[in-house]
A protein has these predicted regions:
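Short loop immediately C-terminal to the Walker-B catalytic DE motif
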Residues: 102-103
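Conserved ABC ATPase "signature" region
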Residues: 30, 48-67
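H-loop (His-switch) and adjacent beta-strand-loop-beta switch element
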Residues: 144-158
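H-loop/switch region of ABC-family ATPase nucleotide-binding domains
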Residues: 132-133
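Conserved catalytic motifs of ABC-family nucleotide-binding domains
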Residues: 92
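Conserved ABC ATPase signature
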Residues: 71-75, 79
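Catalytic Walker B motif of ABC-type/P-loop ATPase nucleotide-binding domains
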Residues: 96-99
């Protein structure tokens, strides 16, 4: 249950990515994921072994453990999206919100990404919220679809009829 601002750390966020925005960014996969632990690490302090282990754990969950030392700009769109999901996961969220997560990735990466999100939902009991304009496509992968229009939220699809 999320109730107050102290619960904001229970929400992970994955922004819509653009390959051009990461192309020259001089940070490794490991460093990108670690940024979501800075509130626990402390200002101007080095990560402890437990922080590094947590980063390794989430990179493994998203199948990016072999890319930890690679620069983010040297990855494909699908790989970058997995890194952003790992970044969200590292803070142990109860909910992950993804903004247009399949923008800029190919069909195979898209299918793999949705399979990963489904696995996280089922195995880790994380609620996944996807912001998308492609209702038809996401209906293949989701349990429910809501529409937000003029401050009104409506259920427009439910796999189980609930």
């Amino acid at each position: 249950e999320l109730s107050k601002s102290k619960d904001l750390n229970k929400i992970g966020y994955v922004p819509q990515i653009s390959l051009s925005s990461n192309a020259t960014f001089p940070a490794t996969v490991e460093e990108i994921v670690m940024t979501n632990l800075y509130s626990k690490i402390g200002f101007m302090k080095f990560p402890k072994k437990e922080h590094k282990e947590k980063v390794k754990e989430v990179l493994k969950k998203v199948n990016m453990q072999d890319y930890s030392k690679r620069l983010i700009g040297n990855l494909s769109g699908g790989q970058q999206q997995r890194v952003m999901i790992a970044k969200a996961l590292v803070s142990d969220p109860k909910v992950i919100i993804l903004d247009e997560p399949t923008t800029g990735i190919d069909a195979a990466s898209e299918k793999s990404l949705y399979a990963l999100l489904n696995k996280l939902n089922k195995e880790s009991k994380i609620t996944i919220i996807i912001v998308s304009h492609d209702f038809e496509k996401i209906s293949q992968y989701t349990n429910k679809i809501f529409s937000v229009n003029k401050n009104k939220v409506s259920l427009i699809y439910s796999k189980n009829g609930v």
